[in-house]
Amino acid sequence: MTFSFDTAAAQGAVIKVIGVGGGGGNAINRMVDEGVTGVEFIAANTDVQALSSTKAETVIQLGPKLTRGLGAGGQPEVGRKAAEESEETLTEAISGADMVFITAGMGGGSGTGAAPVIARIAKDLGALTVGVVTRPFGFEGSKRGQFAVEGINQLREHVDTLLIISNNNLLEIVDKKTPLLEALSEADNVLRQGVQGITDLITNPGLINLDFADVKTVMANKGNALMGIGIGSGEERVVEAARKAIYSPLLETTIDGAEDVIVNVTGGLDLTLIEAEEASQIVNQAAGQGVNIWLGTSIDESMRDEIRVTVVATGVRQDRVEKVVAPQARSATNYRETVKPAHSHGFDRHFDMAETVELPKQNPRRLEPTQASAFGDWDLRRESIVRTTDSVVSPVERFEAPISQDEDELDTPPFFKNR
């Protein structure tokens, strides 16, 4: 009996990651440094100087005639036209991909303007198209924030799934003494985790396997998404890992109300079926009724006593996203009294999604270890978690000091006060 065997098909899904603009290029470099494998990296930018330092295998200069390699000048419209000028080159680079990740920092010129164009090209070629982008810091200005909002809305129209990470929330978890460059590099690191957490599901086979077809079913035409990674150890390791995966202070959406959720549990040789089931149940409870759970498991002998839970939730309702990022009119005093950092302990030099925790609302001073259940009094089914971003609180509201003088003081001339 003769069997025909398609060698090309046996190679698995072709995954390409495109870093657009400065932020996307930095994320690509971070992925290469961290040893992300099984994907092809492409860097696309209008700035030739930035492209000269990229570690991507494929480099594309966007709009060479329009920008002459000098960048987009912070104008998304220039970035868009540059991508359209280079559409043929982009199409050739993306062609043949089963899945395309588009990663960018929104708010600038190249990433904000070119990312939606690249997403349209990828989608037209039939690739599963996923956007992983960051929203800018509030201190970068309202204009940049508005550009980011417009760019994200345009990108959402052309991708199957969109994962948004809020840079501003880094301010809530980093130590005040953290150097600026180090804090900014952590935003690139989170972009890397967003991509790697999904690609690992496809490229790393497991005992209960999740393949590209499963990922495509979960992510095709699903809109807003959440991706989280949690690592736990000890007796409550699966509970700890699942909780950390569900909630990250950097993500703008919550798992509540998601349509489909991939849960991948990775552990050492001591990983049990009960633990995999428990992780699935925790995620199921947090997502609510009607969610479709896709469970996968894999063995990594190097993990020993640890368990890693990866969660990819899609189909998050838009009204819940809007609830998280909706404008809130609050005074400077109220803002200082109500907004507390997600972590009150020091900033780890390399922030990892797996190290995030969701704290109770009683505003603890320090995160103390406990021997009790990892759940504590935490309610998986609470209505929602509101994470504020600088895109919703104006710089005046955030930093303007409240005026405490009484009217008599204001009406008294200075020379009378000094008598």
Swiss-Prot record:
Pfam families: FtsZ_C, Tubulin
Highest taxon of the lineage: Bacteria
Keyword GTP-binding in annotation: yes
Keyword Transferase on entry: no
Region of interest (Disordered), residue spans: 397-419
GO BP of this protein: cell division; division septum assembly; FtsZ-dependent cytokinesis; protein polymerization
Binding site for GTP: G22, G23, G24, G25, N26, G109, S110, G111, E140, R144, D188
Inducing stimuli: Protein level is negatively regulated by KhpA/KhpB at the transcriptional level (at protein level).
Compartments (UniProt record): Cytoplasm
SUPFAM superfamilies: Tubulin C-terminal domain-like (SSF55307), Tubulin nucleotide-binding domain-like (SSF52490)
NCBIfam families named among the record's database cross-references: ftsZ
Function: Essential cell division protein that forms a contractile ring structure (Z ring) at the future cell division site. The regulation of the ring assembly controls the timing and the location of cell division. One of the functions of the FtsZ ring is to recruit other cell division proteins to the septum to produce a new cell wall between the dividing cells. Binds GTP and shows GTPase activity.
UniProt-recorded name of the protein: Cell division protein FtsZ
